Amino acid sequence: MNAPRLIVGLGNPGPEYEATRHNVGFWFVDQLADKLKVSLAPQAKFFGRAARTGETWLLQPTTFMNRSGQAVAALANFYKIPADEILVIHDELDLPPGGIRLKQGGGNGGHNGLKDIQAKLGTPDFWRLRLGIGHPRTLNLSQQVVDFVLHQPRKEELPDIEHALARCLLAWPKLAAGDFAGAQQQLHGKAV
């Protein structure tokens, strides 16, 4: 498998969204940028904040979640990056806080950011790193989903999400080498 050339963290721009569950994709890209010693900077032609390290781009769309595809398609089309060399990191309601799943293709699970990326790329065949935030129903909360994702994780959920982010960073060497099977094995195994 080819190494990913575009790493996209999904989220919403602005300080009011910074610490929300919906922004865990941004959190990952921020941490990865720190690890790789690169700085994200505004890139108007790509509708987001971006950084390049070697042949790999990091991107945080600033289009708001529901229009993430505009940014992803702009950068992917400009650099001729095929869908199977794109890794999108996003919040996942169907996994408990701290759950992780890496997969290629599939549906969008009602996630509007993924839905827009699929529409703008014309294919669902990009890779996804799904970071569990839980669902209000399974966490016994009365919030609607829209409310839930736009709020900060509760203090008892945050350590699990932070641990998942750390595990994803530990898997980065495998991801960067295109060893998705090895990364899946590492990420889907028991947490350490």
UniProtKB/Swiss-Prot annotation:
InterPro entries: Pept_tRNA_hydro, Pept_tRNA_hydro_CS, Pept_tRNA_hydro_sf
EC numbers: 3.1.1.29
Alphabetical keyword list: Cytoplasm, Hydrolase, RNA-binding, tRNA-binding
Biological process according to GO: protein quality control for misfolded or incompletely synthesized proteins; rescue of stalled ribosome
UniProt binding sites for tRNA: Y17, F64, N66, N112
Ranges that cross the membrane: none
Reactions accelerated catalytically: an N-acyl-L-alpha-aminoacyl-tRNA + H2O = an N-acyl-L-amino acid + a tRNA + H(+)
Gene Ontology CC entries for this record: cytoplasm
Record carries keyword RNA-binding: yes
Pfam families: Pept_tRNA_hydro
Residues marked Discriminates between blocked and unblocked aminoacyl-tRNA (site): N12
Annotated catalytic residues: H22
Chain positions of site Stabilizes the basic form of H active site to accept a proton: D91
Subcellular location: Cytoplasm
GO molecular function: peptidyl-tRNA hydrolase activity; tRNA binding
Annotated family: Belongs to the PTH family.
Described function: Hydrolyzes ribosome-free peptidyl-tRNAs (with 1 or more amino acids incorporated), which drop off the ribosome during protein synthesis, or as a result of ribosome stalling. Catalyzes the release of premature peptidyl moieties from peptidyl-tRNA molecules trapped in stalled 50S ribosomal subunits, and thus maintains levels of free tRNAs and 50S ribosomes.
Oligomeric form and interacting partners: Monomer.
Name of this chain's protein: Peptidyl-tRNA hydrolase
Annotated source species: Dechloromonas aromatica (strain RCB)
Gene encoding the protein: pth
